Amino acid sequence: MFSLISFTRQWASVYKPMQHGRKDARGRVRKRFMCIENIAQLANFAKELQSAESPFVAVETNIGGTLTERFMSPEYNVYFFVMGKGKLQDNDGEDADTKQEAMEHAVKFLMYLRQHKEEVNAKGMGMDGASMIDTDNVRFETFGPFMNRWFCVGISLFGLEKMGCINPDDYVSQEGQEEKE
């Protein structure tokens, strides 16, 4: 089954600017991927943010969305962080460049996800979950600066899942309840 968290972790490990999980020149393992509850709770992952390397990607584990009569449309949020250069006061437009770099990482992630969807569809693998994510209509927003001059671009991906029917095995039958009483 498709998991956006696993997919994003795998992307971060093969994407050259990140190479999550591989050793750097000093022999340290590069941490370029993390899960966060949500972007509003930056304080909860501030310690990890201070030790993270630029660029890195984070997936929000809280999921929102909408339910209609027959469909569920979950919203998934992915954030692409880049450390700004220079001092906050003397940036001379560097903040805009940093945000643009974060946006470039987000676009490359979306292209990779689209390619995965096309491969799944071409192989006739059915609906693996990735095919249910709309990569044509993506909302994005910039955030920052955070501590140590971090900036990020957050993207919101929307899914569409058909809700199934009631499974009678999930419930106690009427006869079963009457026997108890």
Predicted regions and their residues:
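Extracellular/virion structural assembly segments
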Residues: S6, R70-E75, V82-R114
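Oligomerization/assembly interface segments of phage tail-like spikes and tubes
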Residues: M72-K87, M147-M163
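C-terminal tail/extension regions appended to the core domain(s) of diverse proteins
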Residues: C152, L157-E181
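Small/polar-rich, solvent-exposed N-terminal microdomains that initiate assembly or binding
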Residues: M1-F71, N121, D170-Y171, E179-E181
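Intrinsic disorder/low-complexity signal
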Residues: V59, M103, I133-T135, D169, ...
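Acidic-leaning, charged glycine-interspersed low-complexity segments
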Residues: H20-D24, K99-L160
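A generic structural signal for ordered alpha-helices
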Residues: C35-E37, K87-N91, T135
